[in-house]
Each structure stands twice: as structure tokens, then as C-alpha cells.
């Protein structure tokens, strides 16, 4: 069965067509600048040339129509007709407390997703637009919603509650939800598989380090804590997001800079993180690593602070699980920045962590980067959120 995986942003749409039998991606692409001048679709069939076409895309329905047209194109398509697409898996950012697992999309499910729009105002409305566009063009094809938040719904109350008046939880469901759940689930399961151990017997910490970044604690196959909160702003220092700060800083900045709450939130989401910390040098870790190696003081400070925060979260999750067996690094930075992994692991001597620097510099494969005598196994596991979404989709429609 071929599964179309859709990830809709407010003005973009990523897609992959995955053969669920072989688990191979047979085509992928990206629609950019939807509803904006200069919109384009990039399409790459497996083993074929990448094609880029600038074409008007006034809305997501037109973007999905172009995706389906590319997949069924006589010359470069990979399926003869839409009948060869067995189901569509949609990435949904926020499922609130309503969804602890993936689900077949019905009218009631769409209503429940819409009720979570307040919790993810940039993402959920776009996710719903993608579902509606697909339903319009593929009315008989089953659709599945896979939630970023679902994996973290096993967190105990003491891990997800904030020290705020309880009425805010009762009225508005203000609590910690966590994100990147599909990645944390895939990577933790893959680590157990690579090690040949039972998932339910392990204590695993996953560090998903991309432009957005989060850490999760997975004990005996269930998530017991994660670093992101009500929104993806909590936790680690990220590309442009601040991560954890003293909440009173917002009032302080408001008085000093004359900014309102929306302007302050823009600073915390778009101008902070390693970008702000590096004196606005870059949010790209390749630039920061170059600067670190050159001895640039801003880059050294930024890299050290970022890695210290990651290590601090790892340490706290060792306490939360009363131990750890495996620490995994994944996502763009976690997979491709050996310097970040080294600097993080320098703080983990108390866990008996010892890194093999040759292994640490290998790329693109599932690998243990700790030495054979390291008391805790440290691994690099490339994430594959699209495959995880396809697997979830197949399990529900078969």
C-alpha cells in the first residue's frame, strides 16, 4: 500500500509517498510560498531528477492538486492513478488532551482538532486546511491524523502540571504537552531495535536537536517527561527560540524597551535562541561551529551555553527515571554536529559516559558513539518522521 504523508505549514506543504511494504520513499517534495507571489513546487521521484516549477498556488487545495498531478504525471509520476494511494497520513501539531494516539479522521476528529487551535494558532489551522484540501480531491481515500503531542500523553501529572492556579488548567487546559512526539517515539524504538533489546526494558533519553529542539525521557516504552511545554517555546535553547527563561523577564523588557506582549513574544520566538545569544550572527550551527573553531567569543559562548542546557536536561531526566541506559541524538543538529555531541557528553562523566571520537564523526547511520566500556550507551539515530507517520497510518487503515 502506498501512503501519502502530508505536513502542512501556513504557507508550505511537505509531502512524501511511501511504499508501506518496502518502507521506501518513492517520491517527495515541497510546495513553498502558498498564497504568496513566487510560489513553487519541488518534486523528486525516487532515482529521478529534482524538478522545480514556479506556478501560482493561491491556496492549499491548489498545492495538493499540483502534488497529486506530479505523482500521477505520465513522464515523471510514480503511480498511474490516485487509486494507487491507499491512505493519507497528516502530521497534526497539537492534539491537546483529546488525542493520546493517532486516529482515523472523521468530522468529529476535525472538530476536536479545531478546538485545539488556541494551543497551536500557527500550525493547527494550516493542518486542517491540508486535510480539507485532501478530502476535496480524494474524497474516498482514508485519512489519518498523527499528532506531535500524542506520544507525551503518558506523562504523569507531576511532570505536566505547572505551578499556576489550578483553575487555569480546569478552564483552559494550561499544562505541559510536549512536541516532536513522532520523532521521539521513532528514535527510542529504533535505538532498542538496533541494540537488540526489549523497548519495554529500557530507560532512554532522546535529544531531538533541530532548529526546534526537545529532550524526552522514555521509561519502559512510555514517555514520562519532555522539555517542551504548553507551546514549543519551553525547554532547550533553540535556533531562534529562547527556551526556559524567568517569566518576569517579559515585564522587565516591556518596561525597558516599551514593547507590548506580542512584540516580546516575537523576540522570544524569532530573535532569541542561539541566534540572539551569538549577537545575531546565525541560527545555523554550521556557522556557529566555524566560529567556535576560529575562537570567536560569541560562538564559543553560544555553543557552550546551548550544550550545557541540553546536558542539564539529560541530568534531570536521569533523576526522573532513576537511571538511564541509552542517550540518543537525532534531527539536523543531533545527527550532523559531532562538536555539539562532544560538548554535551563532556558534562555526563557522572553517568560513566565515554565517547569514541572516530565513531562520533561518522554520518548518516544508526551508530553507537560511546566506547565499549562506557557505562551508558550513547547513539546517533537519524529520525524519520514521515516513515513513522506512514506506519501509524497503515496500522489504522489495514
Task: Specify the residue positions occupied by each region the protein language model found.
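Catalytic phosphate/nucleotide-handling subdomain of diverse soluble enzymes
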Residues: 219, 225-257, 266, 331-362
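Extreme N-terminal starter segment of soluble prokaryotic enzymes
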Residues: 1-4
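Glycine-rich phosphate-binding loop of actin/hexokinase-like ATP-binding domains
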Residues: 151-254
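Phosphate/pyrophosphate-binding loops at sites that engage ATP/ADP/AMP, CoA/4′-phosphopantetheine
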Residues: 70-85, 191-198, 314-325
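A mobile "lid/hinge" subdomain adjacent to the ATP/sugar-phosphate binding pocket shared
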Residues: 257-302
Amino acid at each position: 500500500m502506498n501512503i501519502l504523508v502530508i505536513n502542512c505549514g501556513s504557507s508550505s506543504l511537505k509531502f512524501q509517498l511511501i511504499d508501506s511494504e518496502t518502507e521506501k520513499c518513492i517520491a517527495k517534495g515541497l510546495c513553498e510560498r502558498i498564497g504568496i507571489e513566487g510560489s513553487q513546487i519541488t518534486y523528486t521521484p525516487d532515482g529521478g531528477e529534482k524538478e522545480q516549477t514556479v506556478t501560482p498556488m493561491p491556496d492549499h487545495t491548489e498545492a495538493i492538486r499540483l502534488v497529486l498531478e506530479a505523482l500521477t504525471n505520465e513522464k515523471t509520476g510514480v503511480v498511474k492513478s490516485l487509486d494507487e494511494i491507499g491512505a493519507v497520513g497528516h502530521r497534526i501539531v497539537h492534539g491537546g488532551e483529546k488525542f493520546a494516539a493517532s486516529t482515523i479522521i472523521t468530522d468529529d476528529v476535525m472538530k476536536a482538532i479545531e478546538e485545539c487551535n488556541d494551543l497551536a494558532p500557527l500550525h493547527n489551522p494550516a493542518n486542517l486546511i491540508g486535510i480539507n484540501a485532501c478530502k476535496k480531491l480524494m474524497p474516498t481515500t482514508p485519512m489519518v491524523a498523527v499528532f506531535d503531542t500524542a506520544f507525551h500523553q503518558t506523562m504523569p501529572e507531576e511532570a505536566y502540571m505547572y505551578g499556576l492556579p489550578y483553575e487555569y488548567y480546569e478552564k483552559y487546559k494550561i499544562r505541559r504537552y510536549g512536541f516532536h512526539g513522532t520523532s521521539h517515539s521513532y528514535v527510542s524504538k529504533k535505538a532498542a531495535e538496533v541494540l537488540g533489546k526489549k523497548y519495554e526494558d529500557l530507560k532512554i533519553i532522546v535529544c531531538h536537536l533541530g532548529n526546534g529542539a526537545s529532550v524526552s525521557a522514555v521509561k519502559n516504552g512510555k514517555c514520562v517527561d519532555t522539555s517542551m511545554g504548553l507551546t514549543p517555546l519551553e525547554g532547550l535553547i533553540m535556533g531562534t527560540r529562547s527556551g526556559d527563561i524567568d517569566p518576569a523577564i517579559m515585564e522587565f523588557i516591556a518596561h525597558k524597551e516599551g514593547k507590548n506582549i506580542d512584540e516580546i513574544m516575537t523576540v522570544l520566538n524569532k530573535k532569541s535562541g542561539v541566534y540572539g545569544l551569538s549577537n545575531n550572527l546565525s541560527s545555523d550551527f554550521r556557522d556557529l561551529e566555524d566560529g567556535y573553531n576560529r575562537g570567536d567569543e560569541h560562538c564559543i559562548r553560544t555553543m557552550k551555553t546551548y550544550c550545557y542546557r541540553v546536558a542539564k536536561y539529560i541530568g534531570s531526566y536521569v533523576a526522573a527515571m532513576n537511571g538511564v541506559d541509552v542517550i540518543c541524538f537525532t534531527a539536523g543538529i543531533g545527527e550532523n554536529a559531532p562538536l555539539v555531541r562532544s560538548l554535551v557528553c563532556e558534562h555526563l562523566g557522572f553517568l560513566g559516559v565515554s565517547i569514541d571520537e572516530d565513531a562520533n564523526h561518522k554520518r548518516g547511520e544508526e551508530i553507537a558513539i560511546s566506547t565499549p566500556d562506557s557505562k551508558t550507551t550513547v547513539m546517533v539515530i537519524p529520525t524519520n518522521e514521515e516513515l513513522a507517520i506512514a506506519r501509524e497510518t497503515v496500522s489504522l487503515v489495514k
